[in-house]
Amino acid sequence: MEELVLPVISRQFDKKLLGRYEYVIELAKPEQDEWTNHDVTQIPGRRMFDVAQQGIRDAMHLKPLENDGEVLPRILDMSIACYDMRKTMMKKEGVDFVSNTRWLEWIIQDSMDVQPLRVHINEDHSTVQYDMFSAKVHIDSRKADTTSYHAIAVETKAERKCCHVRTEVWNSVVRNHLFNTAQESCYTFKQTYELIVNSERLSTEEEFRVGAPQFHTIQRNHRMQLGDNAYDKFLKGLVQLRVSGTTPAKIRDEVAALDVIRDNWIRGSFDRSHIKSLELCRLLSSIGRKMVNMEEEPKDEKDLSVKFQFRLDEKFSPNDPERNVIFTSKTHRTNEDRFYVLLVIAASDTNNGRVWWSNPYPCLRGALIAAECKLGDVYHTLRSKYAWGVRPTYKPKDLEREREKYVVGRVNLFDLEGEPATKVIHWEYELISPTYSVSNHKGNQCDLYPDDVEITTKFNEDRYREMIQSVIDDGWDQKNLKMYKILEEEGNPLLYDLEKDINLDSQSQVVFPSYYNKWTHAPMFNARVKPCDIELAERKNDDPFVKRTLKPIKADCVDLLRYHMSHYYDLRPCVKGVSLSIKQTPSGIHQALVQDDSYSRLLRRRDVDLDYSSPCPIITNYFLLEKFHILILTIMEKHYWELDDSDDVYEFPKIDASAFEVDGTLYDISQTIVHMYDRFFEKRRVLRSIDESRWILHLIRISQGRERLEVIERFFPNYGKAMRQRDFKKVRDVMFLNFLPFFFLTGDNISYEHRQWSIPIILYADKLRILPIEVGAHYNRFGVTCILELLNFFPSYEKREEKLEEDIVLCADAIVNFYLQTTISNGGVQTSIVSTKALLYEMYLSSICGGYSEGVLWYLPITHPVKCLVALEVSDALVGADVRIDKIKRRFPLSAKHLKGIVQISVHPNRTFSVTTCGIVKHKVCKKTLLKHRCDVILLQTPGYVFGNDELLTKLLNI
């Protein structure tokens, strides 16, 4: 068969007459007014695809459930490419072909453009109906296995020009944590507390009188706030406070639900059957998220939640040995309070220690917060009223802190409700040196002993030697080696925690830590931090880019990678608004990036026609990709063992737009990582493709031991040779080790296996030091943020030729062994969440730029004289047919030669249509009359080519 017929009908046409046609295009009602855009907010109510109407940042983490199944738009490209990779293999039956199914399985799993479809299935005619605003497409179910939507965000051409050729980069950049904005860590008096002035004195020499409170300038029962007169006197030790609980408005519903459970438990004579531990966990997790971080990255709380539920059942059991102590009748004890007492004890036992607001698990910190609403300072109340003290098995410091009251809690500035001029406590965080003046000859060794600073972070040499000896004896212990353990306790910013370090002593007087309002310099991290009071400058804003305080962290998305101590700030993807909107304004980050001095220079590196002043999100993402690429290569060039000996002084790591040019165009982080090894060790300028780069990193990550080394040697022979030889004599011989973490830390489709492990990095300082750098979801230590700033230090030309100390030689071998075995990147991902966001980003981009253009795309197989494909698309006319045809071709980056023809049908606002064909396909539009109905038909012809059978695509997809 060389001819195909596509009827094009109106809504009035009786579709029963067309039941035997394999494809039918049903036009929608003509538009009344001038047609400029579709109302995409109607999508959730139509049978199109599963994109819900909600906040855009929430939508990024949503698992699509309201759909009829998923389709992968590039599945044919992948399957055909795999078919082309076939190799002959001799079997008993003779010669057979074997496909690279391992590669095919990977590339399908690695795809980020899966579409969750919501279609209508017509059982009478065995057709699948794909809904659009401009038309409906009815496709025979035998032909519908590769049908997908082809959504396009229309480019703006007016005051600024967009470039939407590769819109998928935005999704990838966000998931690689390269599109984040930061707000510094912030603390306030706990919103679950009322801090009531109990007494006032005129000087610290005067004693507070027990039972005889005095009030000189402050009213009795005044509720103290940050920044008021009582607070000023509080800082001077002139007021005594009483702490009582209160319920913040944002968690009032959850606490009310807990109270219902509590009251049923009391009325039911404390029967454990009234305690639904799963429901309690759900409510407490909600409280923990709302009070600390509304948009916290989802954590796998399953195992901990089960443990917590077990502890809850245990504590509420009538046979629990502590129950009699808690239920002993005494003054100030109530059954209502006992419920929350048991909640906190269960949470503490689950945590094997005191629970704080900073606890990484929402359900545990939610238990503490809920109890604070009722009990005030929970652990003080437990000890003073319920004779319960922290257990000896808890951390030693938990015992020391038992008698104090802790009145500040960490809050997230993205979520904090607060008016301008409201006082908070925050951390100022600055790089000590944004750039260094260096030369190749002198290098850039870390100065661990800076002059004229208030507090300096120092290594504890005894603990450091113990760590090195343990590595020599037992190898690299990724779970127990920690950076904070090898630093002196005094001036250790990895141990600072204002929630624990600001307290009320036994006399209810405030105690601040010695580091408060002082700069702590941590030279190994090129960082200095200071906690101090600050005023809010802005109200809460849906745009995360709006800085809330007068002294915020000043860093763009790429510069943030240099802020190593990431527990001193919070992160959010820099997007605002909703998932579905006809028109909305983007985050202010795009305009801010355009103002960067290097914006136009970096964009000129790309071999495409761009508006170098456009704030289009795709163009700003191109800028971030280029900046990331240059920053990584600029830093890592100094860790390659070969270096020109020069006294020329330059700023490092300054971004040079002319540096590290490549043959090819950058679209993915993985290309930069792979190119780093190619560039320095293999002397290649060619940038590998996205699929090849991701495949290389995947193979390295899934292999272990000797197999991993063989994979590295296959793709990077010179680098692999250094790993295999392990000839550690001079400093230059171990410099390749700092490249190893990059194999495992980055990716938009990976998740870490752990919450907090450590990896080895060499620091070049007064001597070579091996440091345990922590990586994981805890404290936002994602991607290269955990290592990058330490890599700014590199050895001088002469240092490279120095003989290695014996301990470094022995540890280097252990480091190689660790990186050959580590499974850091094997945490697994929620594929249904990660892979289904392409349509979401396209819809969101359309609301920021020029609107949404729709289309439905499917394929027909050709069997003779060659096996190939013809693509057919029905779309609106908001985007030109030439643009759509180009986009269709881009769906076949691996097997473009097999796409021999394209049919593009554009539906206009008045419901006329135009047809464009290219390749082997020709067309003709005719009129058809059937009884009293009349319609158009599109006759498609492929002279000399024969359409294939129904199951040819099925066979191809099962090679």
UniProtKB/Swiss-Prot annotation:
Keywords: Capsid protein, Clathrin-mediated endocytosis of virus by host, Host-virus interaction, Inner capsid protein, Viral attachment to host cell, Viral penetration into host cytoplasm, Virion, Virus endocytosis by host, Virus entry into host cell
GO cellular component, one term: viral inner capsid
Iron in keyword set: no
The organism's taxonomic lineage, starting at the top: Viruses, Riboviria, Orthornavirae, Duplornaviricota, Resentoviricetes
GO biological process, one term: clathrin-dependent endocytosis of virus by host cell
UniProt-listed Pfam families: Orbi_VP2
Organism per entry: Bluetongue virus 3 (isolate South Africa vaccine) (BTV 3)
Name of the protein this chain belongs to: Outer capsid protein VP2
Role, per record: The VP2 protein is one of the two proteins (with VP5) which constitute the virus particle outer capsid. It is the major target of the host immunogenic response. Responsible for viral attachment to target host cell, probably by binding to sialic acid. This attachment induces virion internalization predominantly through clathrin-dependent endocytosis.
Record GO terms (molecular function): structural molecule activity
Subcellular location: Virion
Protein family (similarity comment): Belongs to the orbivirus VP2 family.
